[in-house]
Swiss-Prot record:
Main subcellular location: endoplasmic reticulum
Protein name stated in the entry: Transmembrane emp24 domain-containing protein eca
Chain segments annotated as coiled-coil in the UniProt record: 134-164
Keywords: Coiled coil, Developmental protein, Endoplasmic reticulum, Membrane, Signal, Transmembrane, Transmembrane helix
UniProt function note: Eca and bai are essential, though not redundant, for dorsoventral patterning of the embryo. Specifically required during early embryogenesis for the activity of maternal tkv, while the zygotic tkv is not affected.
PROSITE patterns: GOLD
Motif (Prevents secretion from ER): 213-216
Keyword Ribosomal protein: no
Superkingdom classification of source: Eukaryota
Subcellular location: Endoplasmic reticulum membrane
Extent of the signal sequence: 1-20
């Protein structure tokens, strides 16, 4: 049992580790990412925008006029965050429904910079990885042992949320499977009824034809 909990903790650590990447977009392009998040879980997004400089053939810190419009939608397609940020920043939101959350980003630049190439560095942190424990320890004046206990409690809480989310996904999958099986069954029955009716109609038609020709 203890080994199972250790394996589960390792898997969750891998799933909720920081997701650091960068991508290239034009200033009129919209880029979206999907993050599966349990309910009541904090998500922190760090980003930095760089502007392509043709003179140096590289990316430089973007101009002050270039920022990023960030929009976040939950699994019910409800907008939970929509705001314009500067070219470098940090944003956070808390999920209230489990499921896929869509994070979309696009530039708010004016026509002066239209057509330029941007490089966006993105770092998404979910769950306990979104907590700055150094700041927590300093703010609450925690000892090293107290801080470690706090981290363990947060990890246990995150594991519980993840388990609840997995059960939620299993229930949705089971409901979808049952609904699909039911539709397949009714469709098969409908096809059978149609075939029987067509066969009966053809037999009646042939019988009438033979009677008309006085073959029966």
């Amino acid at each position: 049992m203890r080994d199972q909990w250790i394996c589960l903790a390792l898997v969750l650590c891998a799933l909720h580790s920081a997701c650091g990447l960068y991508f290239h977009i034009s200033e009129t392009e919209r880029k979206c990412f999907i993050e599966e998040v349990p309910d009541e879980t904090t998500v922190i997004v760090n980003y930095k925008v760089e502007l392509y400089d043709p003179r140096s053939n590289g990316f430089m810190p973007s101009s002050p006029g270039i920022g990023m419009h960030v929009e976040v939608r939950d699994s019910d397609d409800k907008v939970i965050l929509s705001r314009v940020y500067s070219s470098q920043g940090r944003m956070s939101f808390t999920s209230h429904t489990p499921g896929e959350h869509v994070i979309c980003m696009y530039s708010n630049s004016t026509a002066w910079f239209n057509g330029a190439q941007l490089r966006v560095h993105l770092d998404i942190q979910v769950g306990e990885h979104a907590i700055d424990y150094a700041n927590v320890a300093q703010k609450e004046k925690l000892t090293e042992l107290q801080l470690r206990i706090r981290q363990l409690l947060d990890q246990v809480e995150q594991i519980t949320k993840e388990q609840n989310y997995q059960r939620y996904r299993e229930e949705r999958f089971r409901h979808t499977s049952e609904s699909t099986n039911s539709r397949v069954l009714w469709w098969s029955l409908a096809q059978t009824v149609v075939l029987v009716c067509m066969g009966f109609w053809q037999m009646r038609h042939l019988k009438s034809f033979f009677e008309a020709k006085k073959l029966v």
